[in-house]
Amino acid sequence: ESHDCSVDVCYNTAIPIGVANKYDAVVLSPGPGLPEESGDLKVFVAEFLGEIPILGVCLGMQALAVQLGGTLYNQQVVKHGVQESIITKRGVLFSQDDSEFEVGLYHSWAVSKEGDYTITAESKNGTVMALENKSLRCYGVQFHPESILTPKGMEILENFLEEVAVETPISAE
């Protein structure tokens, strides 16, 4: 709500499927669990992908990736409360190519590189850390922009809001 945005928080078992189009954008929050174990998450993504801008964070990105033809795999090394460097490519969420910065990780699953999306950030070991499908207006980050371990987190969220505002004015109440 710090950017004059009106915010509703919904449990994944009570996502307002029938009225979701009243929103200018949606942020799909972190887990725990997998997309298929997360209430109405997969149903919501299937119904509204391409209808309204969506930013997926961690589990939210995984749900977007699966809907876009990607797969999930269990990482050999679990990353909970770990800060790592990522390398970005220019996209909606990142303003520069080959920018490197620290992000906070809290996950044990990752997404494949194959899917109907462009990879916009990777860890140094090649794990997908961000993706986008601009034509469907969906964007995802595997890391946590809301974490203190992600110093540029607010900038990433602002980039999403700016993209949404260009395409669909953000309503403020």
Across the structure, where does each feature detected by a protein language model lie?
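Short amphipathic alpha-helix with an adjacent loop that forms part of the alpha/beta core around
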Residues: A14-Y23
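Short loop/edge segments at beta-strand edges and connector loops
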Residues: Y11-T13, N74, L105, A121
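Structural signature of beta-strand start/N-cap positions in the alpha/beta core
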Residues: S6, D24, P53-L55, E102, ...
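Acyltransferase
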Residues: I148-E173
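Catalytic beta-strand/loop cores that center a nucleophilic Ser/Cys/Thr
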Residues: V92-S135
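Conserved hydrophobic/aromatic beta-strand scaffold that supports enzyme active sites
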Residues: Q83-S85, V128-A130, G140
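Cysteine-nucleophile active-site neighborhood
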Residues: Y23-S95, L157-N159
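A short beta-strand-loop structural module common to alpha/beta enzyme folds
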Residues: C5-I15
